[in-house]
């Protein structure tokens, strides 16, 4: 199979054999693919300079197996120079996708959300809402999203003035009388997250805790390396 001029972002690059690179690419049509860029490690030319993260490429490849061979790379001149926590956030998104997105598994709208998030990071928009929205979309695409609007036991709407507990496999349910208040989640925060409203610091804190809780069984015991780049109290 031959594919021409497919938009792509490099999520990860690692040495392959003596002179090549093994690339994880995110594409809108084929999802995440793994491809070999032959000979680029010994090249100092234009092609090698293109193979950097946060640079939207137009890629040609061929191959019937899961491992593709890159036959051409062009730029569409959309390159984002991220810095500081915005750069680390970009690395965090890339690592999440490499770790969790199965090869050639297409999640509708994920490429566009990824690109939009990078653009927003470049513009200097607040990090936490951007990361949480991306995380929750990825969880939904992977089949692990929770319903923030309904009690998973009673199916009644979440109430702003009530408190809930989280079951990562089922959702949120009203707190039993004998439950530990340390784990209570205000319904107001759940409704705010569902609406994409992260204006309150407590909502941002709860959203971050929930995202970590939901990703934990998917990521396993191996920690995300990109988290080591952030300072304590950062939005990752």
Curated annotation (Swiss-Prot):
GO terms for biological process: DNA recombination; double-strand break repair. InterPro entries: ARFGAP/RecO, DNA_rep/recomb_RecO_N, NA-bd_OB-fold, RecO, RecO_C. Pfam families: RecO_C, RecO_N. Transmembrane segments: none annotated. GO terms for cellular component: bacterial nucleoid. Keywords: DNA damage, DNA recombination, DNA repair. The keyword DNA damage applies. SUPFAM superfamilies: ArfGap/RecO-like zinc finger, Nucleic acid-binding proteins. The keyword DNA repair applies. Involved in DNA repair and RecF pathway recombination. Belongs to the RecO family. This is DNA repair protein RecO. It comes from Cellvibrio japonicus (strain Ueda107) (Pseudomonas fluorescens subsp. cellulosa).
């Amino acid at each position: 199979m031959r594919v021409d001029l497919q938009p792509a972002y490099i999520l990860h690059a690692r040495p392959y054999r003596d002179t090549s690179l093994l690339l994880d690419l995110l594409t809108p049509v084929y999802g995440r693919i793994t491809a070999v860029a032959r000979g680029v490690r010994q090249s100092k030319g234009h092609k090698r300079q293109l193979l950097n993260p946060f640079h939207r490429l137009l890629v040609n490849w061929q191959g019937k197996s899961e491992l593709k061979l890159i036959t051409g790379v062009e730029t569409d001149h959309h390159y984002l120079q991220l810095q500081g926590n915005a750069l680390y956030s970009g690395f965090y998104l890339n690592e999440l996708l490499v770790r969790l997105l199965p090869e050639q598994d297409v999640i509708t709208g994920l490429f566009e959300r990824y690109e939009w998030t990078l653009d927003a990071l470049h513009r200097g928009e607040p990090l936490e809402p951007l990361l949480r929205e991306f995380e929750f979309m990825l969880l939904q695409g992977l089949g692990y999203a929770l319903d923030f609007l309904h009690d998973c036991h009673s199916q009644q709407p979440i109430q702003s003035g009530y408190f809930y507990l989280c079951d990562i496999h089922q959702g949120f349910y009203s707190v039993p009388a004998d439950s530990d208040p340390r784990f209570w989640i205000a319904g107001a925060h759940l409704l705010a997250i569902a609406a994409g409203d992260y204006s309150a610091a407590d909502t941002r804190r709860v959203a971050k805790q929930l995202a970590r809780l939901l990703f934990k069984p998917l990521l396993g015991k191996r920690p995300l390396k990109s988290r080591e780049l952030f300072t304590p109290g950062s939005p990752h």
